[in-house]
Amino acid sequence: MNKKTRKIVFVGLYIALAVVLQYVSGLIPFLQMPNGGNIDLGVIPVLMASYQFGYKTGIFTGLLCWLINLVLGISGSWFVSIPQYLFDYILPVSLLGLASAFPKIGKINNIYTGVTGAMILKYLSHVLSGVYYWFPETTY
């Protein structure tokens, strides 16, 4: 099999796996938080794609996962404003693809630093989304 064909097939498999895991994690009650949010299993295939093919393909895989979840209605998106939607839904999934871009620190393998760094970036993106949603009310 050609390298490009192999890459396309694997990215398709990672996207399909991410969509299925996102759907399944929405069905499992103990993964749902009482005040909103959940533990998302769909991030695992995006991280795997990033480490197998590099951060550019990881970002692309994350964006396609978001798009397919949006089309299928799995993600349960909540639109308030464009910056809020960008920072809460599009950017976090894309930032997961950056996991392979984090370097090795000392004796710590770059998988640990990459996954931790990508999850911190994802968290910061959600925090910025909250700022865009809650901050305008307190400015008056």
Model-assigned labels for residue ranges:
Residues 1-140:
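Loop-helix junctions at membrane interfaces
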